[in-house]
Amino acid sequence: MTKSELIERIVTHQGQLSSKDVELAIKTMLEQMSQALATGDRIEIRGFGSFSLHYRAPRVGRNPKTGQSVRLDGKFVPHFKPGKELRDRVNEDES
């Protein structure tokens, strides 16, 4: 699902909200979440999951075109851990 598809679904289910209002709310929420992660904060949405940063240590990688070894610096990457309710719901839908 894309961001625009999410906006359409919310507008369809919440008829009293305009498309512009929903778009602004989603953009604001995503911007706030991005800022929180950028400052090292953890985000927890109960029943859905949590977002945090995981550190990837420096390592030696390979350039896929040349096969030459390349040193890669350590970095932080966003990580999502689904909550129990989300895991249960996903597994329930597969049955």
From Swiss-Prot:
Single annotated GO MF: structural constituent of chromatin
SMART domains from the UniProt entry: BHL
GO cellular component: chromosome; cytosol
Keywords: DNA recombination, DNA-binding, Transcription, Transcription regulation, Translation regulation
Location of the region described as Disordered in the Swiss-Prot/TrEMBL record: 59-95
Biased composition annotated in UniProt, kind: Basic and acidic residues: 72-95
Highest taxon, organism lineage: Bacteria
HAMAP family named in the record: IHF_beta
Function: This protein is one of the two subunits of integration host factor, a specific DNA-binding protein that functions in genetic recombination as well as in transcriptional and translational control.
Protein name: Integration host factor subunit beta
Source organism of the structure: Ectopseudomonas mendocina (strain ymp) (Pseudomonas mendocina)
Primary gene name: ihfB
